[in-house]
Amino acid sequence: MNRRGNLKLITASIALGFGLAAGVTGSALAQSKDTIKVGILHSLSGTMAISETVLKDTVLMAIDEINAKGGVMGKKLEPVVVDPASNWPLFAEKTKQLLTQDKVAVIFGCWTSVSRKSVLPVVEELNGLLFYPVQYEGEELSKNVFYTGAAPTQQAIPAVDSLMSKEGGGAKRWVLLGTDYVYPRTTNKILRAYLKSKGVADKDIDEKYTPFGHSDYQTIVADVKKFSAGGKTAVVSTINGDSNVPFYKELGNAGLKAKDVPVVAFSVGEEELRGVDTKPLVGHLAAWNYFMSLKNPANDEFTKKWAAYAKAKKLPGADKPLTNDPMEATYIGINMWKQAVEKAKSTDTDKVIAAMAGQTFKAPSGITSKMDEKNHHLHKSVFIGEVKADGQFNVVWKTPGPVKAKPWSPYIEGNATKPDEPVKK
């Protein structure tokens, strides 16, 4: 070996020695660079792309906005986008890739609970950080996840209360209709127990499930119509993904109007109604913690930003830019994460987790959104909106103020003794 080769080898050995002596890890090396990498884990293909693609774009918009203001701790955010393609095991693989190969500081992603459940053991094992922006069934609390969507106490229970009330139509019979996976089944388990606690008999509750991507709702809608002949009926829909389009089309075909059998949906917002003739659906309901139609300065700013971004990036649907609840939850999440990193003066997972407690952000829903000091969930207002002919929602009911999440439902046996904060591992 020549002298130059020896010199290179010695230099490399010294550098490696210093690195090992200092305990340099992949995370620390990633921090030492000029950018902070941010993972975006949303389905851009498959049955969930109808809902998730726009969340990827929301993160990218927020990153552009943060970078334009100087970044985080003087460093630009660098997005790393992957497509888990509505394939639940692939979510876990992509998460591992983001954390071990791409060395991201945080991941924003998932929609379905089955995708989140796939990701959970990976972020826990590798001590990663996931911000999850969609309503879910609860019954989970991880130190490595911040849940910026709603727990059942912030969506499902208030929606049922509203439909049971005299003002909401006084429903006596209930069809619990969902996609066949953990979120609908667990939510409906909670709702069945809740309805029974309110005196509703088993014979007045019907549960139905369809697979992801299901497209033929003729028989199910006919069954709902028949069931509703037994008394004032409401449908609670936890159908997810592109199946919502044929379901709502079939409601229209069958002439099942909201005044006869109102449907309240937990996974249908402005984006999902884009491909549907909404005129037959006028008056049907959705329960969320945000609607595009809310009038307040923070939402005016949010919707204008999104419209400008969609136009500039030539996004699909830019001619009719829409915002929805999971977009708002995503936007709150990345801004709170930024604030927490700056408070912690580090992207270290444990330091950021500690700094997230009690973070606040002026949310497009019109409230100052707060991350609970203990349970990793946002305090959220609840709104029920009626579908309008233009595909927007008219808010007909809301909670007096923000509602605290209860991750462990009091309507599931054994939950009373579970702590309202993640168990340290």
Feature-to-residue mapping (PLM):
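Extracellular/periplasmic periplasmic-binding protein-like sensory domains
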Residues: 251-331, 342-345, 399-424
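Periplasmic-binding protein-like
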Residues: 98-110, 131-133, 173-178, 230-241, ...
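Extracellular/periplasmic Venus flytrap/periplasmic-binding protein
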Residues: 90-93, 137, 144-254, 297, ...
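Extracytoplasmic "Venus flytrap"
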Residues: 39-58, 82-89, 111-114, 179-185, ...
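Solvent-exposed, acidic/polar segments of extracytosolic/periplasmic ligand-binding ectodomains
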Residues: 36, 360-425
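Short, low-complexity disordered leader/linker segments with a strong preference
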Residues: 1-37, 68, 418-425
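Beta-alpha junction/loop-to-helix N-cap segments that form part of ligand/metal-binding clefts
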Residues: 50-57, 69-140, 148, 209-218, ...
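Signal peptide-proximal N-terminal region
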Residues: 31-33, 57-79, 169, 197-202
